[in-house]
């Protein structure tokens, strides 16, 4: 029997998880998804995600793939069954068949993240916003964000001692916009991201907004390719993976 590959489009609230990737010391999104698939398919099934979100980080859209040997699956039934088996804070939008060599991680052409900050104390969104207590200069922060387009090596914003072979990324979009009177959103899109990269960029841009770093300082931090020179990473609870893009030809 032939082996088919399927993409799962899902969302999750990362509050109570130790990130996407299976961990020895805590529950992960990947583990929950693999358990649900194993129950439904009645065999252990590996799941590969488009990326590895950190502990506490959310996804309004994540993509993962799995293989199945046997008769082609009814994708609507798979999605429906997974939603019954998964916890309330993980939801499957759809499942679709892709070409056998399609890869959720390596075939992704772009990923988009959003980071939310708020200027007010509000109990109902505290898990999804980073509260800022002092005024920020968003014009300066956007000026600094524009410099990201001029560089490709983002070692300064990468978690230290990771197993990645290259720190080269192509940034396609990076901008702060105001969502309402109290909420600002940083949207960033790139072909790939390094571990902790978005939170490190946000944390450093916040230092620019507070007047502790200039736009020139921000540029120098990138050029120094030294994580110790950049700002503290912003908390993970306000970060969302919101989109992953693929070339049309990988779909069946």
From Swiss-Prot:
HAMAP family in the cross-refs: TruA
Residues annotated for substrate binding in this entry: 113
GO molecular-function term, one example from the UniProt record: RNA binding
The entry's keywords: Isomerase, tRNA processing
Gene3D superfamilies: Pseudouridine synthase I, catalytic domain, C-terminal subdomain (3.30.70.660), Pseudouridine synthase I, catalytic domain, N-terminal subdomain (3.30.70.580)
Record GO biological process: tRNA pseudouridine synthesis
The protein's Enzyme Commission number: 5.4.99.12
CDD domains noted in UniProt: PseudoU_synth_EcTruA
Subunit text: Homodimer.
Record's protein name: tRNA pseudouridine synthase A
Xref: PANTHER family: PSEUDOURIDYLATE SYNTHASE (PTHR11142), TRNA PSEUDOURIDINE SYNTHASE-LIKE 1 (PTHR11142:SF0)
Family: Belongs to the tRNA pseudouridine synthase TruA family.
Active site: 54 (nucleophile)
InterPro entries according to UniProt: PsdUridine_synth_cat_dom_sf, PsdUridine_synth_TruA, PsdUridine_synth_TruA_a/b_dom, PsdUridine_synth_TruA_C, TruA/RsuA/RluB/E/F_N
Organism: Bacteroides fragilis (strain YCH46)
Catalytic activity from the UniProt record: uridine(38/39/40) in tRNA = pseudouridine(38/39/40) in tRNA
Functional description taken from the UniProt entry: Formation of pseudouridine at positions 38, 39 and 40 in the anticodon stem and loop of transfer RNAs.
Domain of life according to the entry: Bacteria
UniProt gene name: truA
Pfam families for this protein: PseudoU_synth_1
